[in-house]
């Protein structure tokens, strides 16, 4: 694009930079998007100058539109950008990318153009092109039906390359996994034996699996011939013969005969549906061969998440060649039985017949690192408690159970107690104070540890004005009573010391020394 912005002039560039990338977003288109689009055009073999005009953008859209539904994110982004440029060249007012894509679909009629192109490219068996006006779709069929009616004749429409490409990619990626059977059923809906053989012939690899399918086809064809013998005698002129097993397999019948058996024969024989059932039986055998693991062998690993185990289990159930009742019984009995011990304990606690949603919710997180750490912590705690009990049993009598000092319950210690911490005295057992401040016990002098100074032998006299109000009632304190008794006793002793000793008047004369020595004394 030269200067990378030559695709738009100044006015168009201003309009381009006002278009939002998403309806609810704030980001808008910039010049760098045009530069990126010019580089991406080379990947699809398109010249970058096609972006400079409306017709060029229309040609780009016609090339990218068939690839857009199944394309990569880069292809879808390029398609959206070209739609925006188309609207800018056409002077259409758009606000975001979705509006531009909707306008392009309306203006270009891409859906109708694609259908008309597919119809015009198909030719009749005689080599002439079909007339679209006279082509109708079989009743109950889709527009991609492999047979269409033109007048009174049915015309075969071969499978599109896109359908064959999708089938080949599915086989290469899944390697005949359990998904191949429903994929074949979806792609072969309404096909003739010729179309089904074409789907099998495009598979270059996996010839061993195709040989198994051929053996199943031969067995079913032989059983068909036994169950439907040909009529005796020659057929009337103009009457269509009955299909044999090889006719159903498409080896001895033409495409026109297959269409007549399906749509115009009386009675009709849907050889396409019959041959499709045979192929499905063969594919189921291949799935079982390529997936030898039985559902009985699916077990959950010790560190495997339950969700991953459920995915592996149902994938094996899907590959099992059994009826629906058998699969239901296997699911109900084996899903819980083959789980690991951790999940099995949880699943058995859910009761009888829990739903899959309940099981996935209950086992969520089981097997992860956090769950393993929790289990290891519980195991370590149990081992420590057992060791402590064994050590205590060797010394003598068993140790009593642990009791919480905070709440008084058994089974845990104070540091593990969930209740709020309470302050309790170790001496008296009452809450509200500690042992160092306990007033319920005194020493031999009658004084407790709460007094900081040396105790006196008498109550200290209070100086100053005494309050007129009566003192507040205080609870009974035995220490105060004992202290008062000691104070009263001390007061009595001091008073007795101050009094002179008692003298008996009878002793003054009889016991005096004056009577013995006279005045010498």
From Swiss-Prot:
Capsid protein p24 is phosphorylated. Specific enzymatic cleavages by the viral protease yield mature proteins. The polyprotein is cleaved during and after budding, this process is termed maturation. A motif (Nuclear export signal) lies at residues 16-22. Residues 116-144, 489-521 are annotated as: Disordered. InterPro entries: Gag_p24_C (IPR045345), Lentvrl_matrix_N (IPR000071), Matrix_HIV/RSV_N (IPR012344), Primate_lentivir_Gag_pol-like (IPR050195), Retrov_capsid_C (IPR008916), Retrov_capsid_N (IPR008919), Retrovr_matrix (IPR010999), Znf_CCHC (IPR001878). The keyword RNA-binding applies. A lipid is attached at residue 2 (N-myristoyl glycine). The record marks 443-444 as: Cleavage. A motif (PTAP/PSAP motif) lies at residues 467-470. GO terms for biological process: viral budding via host ESCRT complex; viral translational frameshifting. A zinc finger (CCHC-type) spans 402-419, 423-440. The keyword Repeat applies. A motif (Nuclear localization signal) lies at residues 26-32. Keywords: Capsid protein, Host cytoplasm, Host nucleus, Host-virus interaction, Lipoprotein, Metal-binding, Myristate, Phosphoprotein, Repeat, RNA-binding, Viral budding, Viral budding via the host ESCRT complexes, Viral nucleoprotein, Viral release from host cell, Virion, Zinc, Zinc-finger. Late-budding domains (L domains) are short sequence motifs essential for viral particle budding. They recruit proteins of the host ESCRT machinery (Endosomal Sorting Complex Required for Transport) or ESCRT-associated proteins. p6-gag contains one L domain: a PTAP/PSAP motif, which interacts with the UEV domain of TSG101. This is an African green monkey isolate. Matrix protein p17 targets Gag and Gag-Pol polyproteins to the plasma membrane via a multipartite membrane binding signal, that includes its myristoylated N-terminus. Also mediates nuclear localization of the preintegration complex. Implicated in the release from host cell mediated by Vpu. Belongs to the primate lentivirus group gag polyprotein family. This is Gag polyprotein. It comes from Simian immunodeficiency virus agm.vervet (isolate AGM3) (SIV-agm.ver). The gene is gag.
């Amino acid at each position: 694009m030269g200067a990378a912005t030559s695709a738009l002039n100044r006015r168009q560039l201003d309009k381009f930079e006002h278009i939002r990338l998403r309806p609810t977003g704030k980001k808008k288109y910039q010049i760098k998007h045009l530069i990126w689009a010019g580089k991406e055009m080379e990947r699809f073999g398109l010249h970058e100058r096609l972006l400079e005009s409306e017709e060029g953008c229309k040609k780009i859209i016609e090339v990218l539109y068939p690839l857009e539904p199944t394309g990569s994110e880069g292809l879808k982004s390029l398609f959206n950008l070209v739609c925006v440029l188309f609207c800018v060249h056409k002077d259409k007012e758009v606000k975001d990318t979705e509006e531009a894509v909707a306008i392009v679909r309306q203006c270009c009629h891409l859906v109708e153009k694609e259908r008309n192109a597919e119809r015009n490219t198909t030719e009749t068996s005689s080599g002439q092109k079909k007339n679209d006006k006279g082509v109708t779709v079989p009743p109950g069929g889709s527009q991609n039906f492999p047979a269409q009616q033109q007048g009174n004749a049915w015309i075969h429409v071969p499978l599109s390359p896109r359908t064959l490409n999708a089938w080949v990619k599915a086989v290469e990626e899944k390697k005949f996994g359990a998904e191949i059977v429903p994929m074949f059923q979806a792609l072969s809906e309404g096909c003739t034996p010729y179309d089904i053989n074409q789907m099998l012939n495009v598979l270059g690899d996996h010839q061993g699996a195709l040989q198994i399918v051929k053996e199943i086809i031969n067995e079913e064809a032989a059983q068909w011939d036994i169950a439907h013998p040909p009529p005796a005698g020659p057929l009337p002129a103009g009457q269509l013969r009955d299909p044999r097993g090889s006719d159903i397999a498409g080896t001895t019948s033409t495409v026109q005969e297959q269409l007549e058996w399906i749509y115009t024969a009386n009675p009709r024989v849907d050889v396409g549906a019959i041959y499709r059932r045979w192929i499905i039986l063969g594919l189921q055998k291949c799935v079982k061969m390529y997936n030898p693991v039985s559902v009985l062998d699916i077990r959950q690993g010790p560190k495997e998440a339950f969700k991953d185990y459920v995915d592996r289990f149902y994938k094996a159930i899907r590959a099992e060649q059994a009826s629906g009742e058998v699969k239901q019984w296997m699911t109900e009995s084996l899903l819980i039985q083959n789980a690991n011990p951790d999940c099995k304990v949880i699943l058995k606690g859910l009761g009888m017949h829990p739903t899959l949603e309940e099981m996935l919710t209950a086992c969520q997180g089981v097997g992860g690192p956090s769950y393993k750490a929790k289990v290891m912590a519980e195991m370590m705690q149990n081992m420590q408690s057992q060791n402590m009990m064994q050590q205590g049993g060797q010394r003598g009598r068993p140790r009593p159970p642990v009791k919480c000092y905070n709440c008084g319950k058994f089974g845990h210690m104070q540091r593990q107690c969930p209740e709020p911490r309470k302050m309790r005295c170790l001496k008296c057992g009452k809450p509200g104070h500690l042992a160092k401040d306990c007033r319920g016990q005194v020493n031999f002098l009658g004084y407790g540890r709460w007094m900081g100074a040396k105790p006196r032998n008498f109550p200290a006299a209070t100086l100053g004005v005494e309050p007129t109000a009566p003192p507040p009632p205080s609870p009974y304190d035995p220490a105060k009573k004992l202290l008062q008794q000691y104070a009263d006793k001390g007061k009595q002793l001091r008073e007795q010391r101050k009094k002179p000793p008692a003298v008996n008047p009878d002793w003054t004369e009889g016991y005096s020394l004056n009577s013995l020595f006279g005045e010498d004394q």
